Amino acid sequence: IKSLPPSFSTNITIKTITDSTLTSSMLRKVLPFLLFLISMAASAQQYVRKTNLPTVYINTFNNAAITSKEVYIYATMHYVDENDSIAVYDSLQIRGRGNSTWGLAKKPYKVKFKTKQKVLGKGRAKAKSWTLIANAGDKTLMRNAITSFMGEFAGLKFNPAAKFVDLVLNGTYMGNYQISDQVDVRPHRVNIKEQDLPLTDTSDITGGYFLEVDGFKDGNCFTTTTYNVPIRIHYPDEEDIVYSQNQYIRNYVTQ
């Protein structure tokens, strides 16, 4: 439009309240504003809530399919909250997540923002990484959320967030999802004492640590001697942890 401005040989009369005459030069001035209003109206109609829940719209670059749990692809996100306010995130990455759940038709995802975001508001983490849980194996869609709420009621120190939303991915409605915390070490998540790295001969290696009882042996993992239970060490990271810390954890768990 900028390279081909409209040109008229005669004036155009537009019927308005004042019955005024709009010249071609005036039209050139107001046309960008009119196009902006049309664009805003179209955007408002495009990003609306599907139900009474918030709706998350994610569009990947070139509508690329999400096929990997390891490789992120770029995307944008529009978050329509309960009050129909729209938050726009124009630079994020998304990939698959989960173990057995990744093989189901309704897949879970992990999103990573360019900067830390307080997606769920006050009292929740400000972080780059968040998860979209599909709850595909749960017909009620509520077991994970109920477990989190029960943990809060019991006074557990950390309970993953449980915010239900509708997900639209590349224009396709995917159904009900749950925005949840990526389980990692930070305030409002797993808030443990982080160790000073690199370690010295006098460093205190008694904690904190972040371990997971896992059914899958991946990452920095060991198996308990008595019950043969896989334990995964999430913190310190695999590239940061040293031999003395690994041995301390194994001895502590198997005592």
Model-based region annotation:
Residues 1-7, 13, 17-46:
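Bacterial Sec-dependent N-terminal signal peptides
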